């Protein structure tokens, strides 16, 4: 299946190397006047509710930075707000009590991953009818249980990761064993060489591993602090929603923090409630795909729930880039949300007894095509399209973050 996320290569925004993104954001922050402290640890943070002010003690590892001294340095700073952008680690301070609250999540997956040189192109799957080169896209190689991602960057490195249920054991050896059991993947990786990430105690590359990626915190905010979406919760890389979700949080929090204190807290309370609903929604969009496995046809059918959500959401952004739509990825859409719930329940009911009702499940793509018809303007599940969609969303330039920021600055 091929679905174009961008109308043209010039507007595409996929396959960002994380280190490049981080460097870009750091440069933008500096240009905007922010002070950037790298290799710095938060030792303590104390909040004064009367003054609405934090007093924070920081420690910088001068051996890793351009400090004048070779000894670690400590500094004290004050701030009215702390924005938690730490990701899964969370801020470690007694003043912020925010335990894990992931029990509600349907998606429970882990991953083992690395950056490789020498990954071969996936020529075997190409077709003259392809709307674009599949190697230029985020590839999802579906297994009976789980999947393998391949993201080819333009400097010869490919990010490869194996995603499976969190109950599955993870190791570099297991990664290669799974690939060897799938000849098409084994052929792609036959001459691949691991180049990153580097091990903590050596310069030798060692594959990274996360036992459970799916997570959520109890709260998105508290007195004087607030989380970006990536720190509050994350579901799974299946639909590549993480960066977009976090950027949506940047836009919303910027607007809230620039308002007066009363309006700010009200906006942040709303933001927190929205984040919980958004994580639940993304969880639903992902979990249904896993519930559909090992059927490729049913997986594609349920994946259309994500595609419709993305198309409708980006359509709203394109109409008015200066107005943030209510509900990330249509999670507040009163017409669309029941359709996705219905599709998910259909799959779950058919598998509740652990004896899959194959005749019923075989009808799932037909049902989905009927359910999505009012929104389906691009030919999803249309036999004539042969699962190849050349155009699905509005031009990215119309919904750029730059356009949103210009509107916020007015």
What spans do the regions from the language model cover?
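FAD/FMN-dependent oxidoreductases across multiple families
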Residues: 148, 168-286
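Short amphipathic alpha-helical face segments that pack within enzyme cores
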Residues: 20, 24, 111, 245-252
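Conserved N-terminal/central alpha/beta ligand/cofactor-binding core
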Residues: 1-41
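C-terminal helical "tail/cap" subdomain of flavin- and related membrane-associated enzymes
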Residues: 255-410
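Predominantly flavin-linked oxidoreductase catalytic cores and closely associated redox partners
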Residues: 28-192, 250
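Alpha-helix N-cap/helix-initiation motif
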Residues: 10, 14, 18, 101, ...
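Generic detector of well-ordered alpha-helical packing
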Residues: 23, 85-86, 231, 237
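Tryptophan-centric aromatic hotspots in well-structured domains and transmembrane helices
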Residues: 14, 18, 47, 54, ...
């Amino acid at each position: 299946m091929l679905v174009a996320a961008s109308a043209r290569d010039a507007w595409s925004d996929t396959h960002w190397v994380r280190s490049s993104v981080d460097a870009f954001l750091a440069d933008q922050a500096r240009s905007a006047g922010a002070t950037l402290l790298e290799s710095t640890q938060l030792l303590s943070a104390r909040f004064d509710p009367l003054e609405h002010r934090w007093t924070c003690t920081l420690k910088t590892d001068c051996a890793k930075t351009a400090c004048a001294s070779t000894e670690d340095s400590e500094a004290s700073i004050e701030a009215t707000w702390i924005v938690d952008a730490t990701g899964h680690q969370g801020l470690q301070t007694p003043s912020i009590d925010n335990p894990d609250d992931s029990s509600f999540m349907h998606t429970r997956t882990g991953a083992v991953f690395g950056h490789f040189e020498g990954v071969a192109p996936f020529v075997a799957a190409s077709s003259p009818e392809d709307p674009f080169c599949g190697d230029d896209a985020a590839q999802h190689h579906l297994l009976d249980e789980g999947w393998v991602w391949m993201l080819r960057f333009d400097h010869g490195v490919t990010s490869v990761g194996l995603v499976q249920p969190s109950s599955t054991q993870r190791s570099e050896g297991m990664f290669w064993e799974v690939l060897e059991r799938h000849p098409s993947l084994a052929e792609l990786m036959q001459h691949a060489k691991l180049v990153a990430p580097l091990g903590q105690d050596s310069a030798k590359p060692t594959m990274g591993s996360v036992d459970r990626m799916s997570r959520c915190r109890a709260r998105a905010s508290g007195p004087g602090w607030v989380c970006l979406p990536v720190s509050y919760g994350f579901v799974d890389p299946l639909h590549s929603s993480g960066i977009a979700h976090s950027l949506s949080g940047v836009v919303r929090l910027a607007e809230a923090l620039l308002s007066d204190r009363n309006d700010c807290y009200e906006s942040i309370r709303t933001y927190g409630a929205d984040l919980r609903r958004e994580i639940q929604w993304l969880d639903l969009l992902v979990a249904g795909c896993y519930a559909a496995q090992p059927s490729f046809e049913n997986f594609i059918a349920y994946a259309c729930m994500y595609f419709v959500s993305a198309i409708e959401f980006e359509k709203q952004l394109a109409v008015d880039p200066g107005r943030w739509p209510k509900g990330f990825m249509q999670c507040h859409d009163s017409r669309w949300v029941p359709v996705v719930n219905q599709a998910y329940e259909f799959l779950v009911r058919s598998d509740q007894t652990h004896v899959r009702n194959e005749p019923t499940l075989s009808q799932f793509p037909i049902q989905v095509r009927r359910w999505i018809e009012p929104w389906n303007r691009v030919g999803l599940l249309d036999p004539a399209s042969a699962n190849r969609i050349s155009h699905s969303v509005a031009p990215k330039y119309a919904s750029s973050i730059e356009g949103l920021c210009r509107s916020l600055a007015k």
